[in-house]
UniProtKB/Swiss-Prot annotation:
Pathway: Cell wall biogenesis; peptidoglycan biosynthesis. Keywords: Cell cycle, Cell division, Cell inner membrane, Cell membrane, Cell shape, Cell wall biogenesis/degradation, Glycosyltransferase, Membrane, Peptidoglycan synthesis, Transferase, Transmembrane, Transmembrane helix. GO terms for molecular function: lipid-linked peptidoglycan transporter activity; peptidoglycan glycosyltransferase activity. Its EC number is 2.4.99.28. GO terms for cellular component: cell division site; plasma membrane. Its main location: membrane. This is Probable peptidoglycan glycosyltransferase FtsW. It catalyses: [GlcNAc-(1->4)-Mur2Ac(oyl-L-Ala-gamma-D-Glu-L-Lys-D-Ala-D-Ala)](n)-di-trans,octa-cis-undecaprenyl diphosphate + beta-D-GlcNAc-(1->4)-Mur2Ac(oyl-L-Ala-gamma-D-Glu-L-Lys-D-Ala-D-Ala)-di-trans,octa-cis-undecaprenyl diphosphate = [GlcNAc-(1->4)-Mur2Ac(oyl-L-Ala-gamma-D-Glu-L-Lys-D-Ala-D-Ala)](n+1)-di-trans,octa-cis-undecaprenyl diphosphate + di-trans,octa-cis-undecaprenyl diphosphate + H(+). The keyword Glycosyltransferase applies. GO terms for biological process: cell wall organization; FtsZ-dependent cytokinesis; peptidoglycan biosynthetic process; regulation of cell shape.
C-alpha cells in the first residue's frame, strides 16, 4: 500500500470519527452500555438461585432481562431517529395519554395487582408499569410547556402553578395505586425543571415546603408507610419482620468490604434478601464487588448526570430550548432514581420500590429509560447539526 493510500485511509477514519462524534455522545453512550452490561451480569448472579428453585431454570430472569435490553435498545434507536419537533408538537397529547394510563390502571379488573399495589397493565408477554411511562411522557410535556411558557413561569405565579397542578394530579393517581416512589420522582422532575427554567425562589421554596409537608403527612397517616419509616429509622429493632429486608441489605453491603466476596459468591441473595435481582440489586453488587464496584456504579451514574446537563446546556446555548429541558429532565429522572435506590439499599432512605435504572430486572423501566436515553442522544445530535453554539440567544432560566 502506497503512502497516498495510507493517508487516504487515515483521513477516511478521521472523517468517520467526526461523523460519529456529531451523531452520538460517545461518553454518554459508553456509560449507558456499561450500566446495561453490568446490570445483566448482576441480574444473572442475583437471580440464579431463586430462578432455579421456583422456575426450574437458573437463567430464566437473565434471558428475560436480555430480551428487555434488546427491546430497550430498539426503543432507544427509534426515539433517536424521531425529530424533537414531533415530540414538542405532541406534548399535549402525550400529557393526555399519560393521564389515560394512570386512570386506566385503577379501573377494577383492568390493572394488575402485585403485593397489594395495582401498578401494571397486562400486555400479554409482560406487564407494563404505567408509572414508568408517565415519567417519560411528563418529562416531554414539561419540556414543551417550559419552551412555550418560560416567561410566564418566571414572571407569573399562574405560569408556575399550572404545570405543578397537573403534576400533583398525576402524583395523586400514583399514590392511589399506590406508588409512592414514582410520585416522589415525578414531582422532583417537575420541581427541578421549574427551578432550571428560572422560577422565583420564593415560589419554588413555598412549593417544595408544601410538597414535603404533604408527603410527610401521607407517610405518617398511612400505616404501612409508617411501618416502613419506622423500619428505616431502626431496622434492627424488628430484624425478622418490618426491618428484615433492610437488615439483610445492610448485611450484604457490609460483607462486601473493599473488593467484595467475588462475583457469584453472594450469600444474601440465597433466599435471605427479598427482591435481590430487582429493587435490591445494588446490595448484591456491593456484596460481590465491594466498595470498588459501588464506586464504579456511582461514577457511571454521576457521569450520566454530568453528560445530560452538558447536553442540555449546549442545546440551550444553541437556542434548542425544548431539547435543553428534555435533557435536564432525563438527567434528573435517571440519576435521582438511581441515587434513591442506592440510598434505600444502604438504609439512608425509606423503602420506595424504585428500580436501579438500566440495571435492575424489569421490562417497563428498561424500555422507558432506554427510550429516554435515545431522546437524550437525539438532543445532542440536533444541537450539533444546528451549527455553532449561539450563546446570545438564551434568555431567562438558570440553565443558561
Amino acid at each position: 500500500m502506497s503512502a497516498v493510500d495510507i493517508q487516504a485511509t487515515r483521513d477516511a477514519g478521521q472523517q468517520l470519527q467526526v461523523r460519529l462524534a456529531q451523531r452520538l455522545d460517545l461518553g454518554l453512550t459508553l456509560s449507558v452500555l456499561a450500566l446495561l452490561g453490568l446490570g445483566l451480569v448482576m441480574v444473572a448472579s442475583a437471580s440464579i438461585g431463586i430462578a432455579d428453585r421456583n422456575l426450574g431454570d437458573p437463567l430464566y430472569f437473565l434471558k428475560r432481562q436480555a430480551a428487555y435490553v434488546v427491546l430497550g435498545l430498539a426503543a432507544a434507536s427509534l426515539a433517536y431517529r424521531i425529530r424533537l419537533a414531533y415530540w414538542e408538537a405532541s406534548a399535549g397529547l402525550l400529557l393526555g395519554f399519560a393521564y389515560f394510563l394512570l386512570i386506566l390502571v385503577l379501573v377494577p379488573g383492568v390493572g394488575v395487582t402485585v403485593n397489594g399495589s395495582t401498578r401494571w397493565l397486562s400486555l400479554g408477554l409482560f406487564n407494563l408499569q404505567v408509572s414508568e411511562v408517565a415519567k417519560l411522557l411528563f418529562t416531554l410535556y414539561l419540556a414543551g410547556y417550559l419552551t412555550r411558557h418560560g416567561r410566564a413561569v418566571r414572571e407569573q405565579f399562574a405560569g408556575f402553578l399550572r404545570p405543578m397542578l397537573l403534576l400533583s394530579g398525576a402524583a395523586l393517581l400514583l399514590l392511589m395505586e399506590p406508588d409512592f416512589g414514582a410520585a416522589v420522582v415525578l414531582m422532583a422532575i417537575g420541581l427541578a425543571l421549574l427551578f432550571l427554567a428560572g422560577a422565583k425562589l420564593w415560589q419554588f421554596a413555598l412549593l417544595v415546603g408544601t410538597v414535603a409537608a404533604a408527603l410527610a403527612m401521607l407517610a405518617i397517616t398511612t400505616p404501612y408507610r409508617m411501618a416502613r419509616l419506622t423500619a428505616f429509622l431502626d431496622p434492627w429493632n424488628d430484624p425478622f419482620n418490618s426491618g428484615f429486608q433492610l437488615t439483610q441489605s445492610l448485611i450484604a453491603i457490609g460483607s462486601g468490604s473493599w473488593f467484595g466476596v467475588g462475583l457469584g459468591a453472594s450469600v444474601q441473595k440465597l433466599f435471605y434478601l427479598p427482591e435481590a435481582h430487582n429493587d435490591f440489586l445494588f446490595a448484591v453488587l456491593a456484596e460481590e464487588l465491594g466498595l470498588v464496584g459501588i464506586t464504579v456504579v456511582v461514577l457511571l451514574y454521576g457521569w450520566f448526570l454530568w453528560r445530560s446537563f452538558g447536553i442540555g446546556r449546549a442545546a440551550e446555548q444553541a437556542g434548542q430550548l425544548f431539547g435543553a429541558y428534555l435533557a435536564y429532565g432525563v438527567g434528573v429522572w435517571v440519576s435521582l432514581q438511581a441515587f434513591i435506590n442506592m440510598g434505600v439499599n444502604m438504609g439512608l432512605l425509606p423503602t420506595k420500590g424504585l428500580t436501579l435504572p438500566l440495571m435492575s430486572y424489569g421490562g417497563s423501566s428498561m424500555l422507558m429509560t432506554c427510550a429516554a436515553v435515545g431522546l437524550l442522544l437525539r438532543v445532542h445530535r440536533e444541537t450539533v447539526e444546528s451549527g455553532p453554539l449561539r450563546v446570545g440567544r438564551v434568555t431567562g432560566g438558570r440553565g443558561a
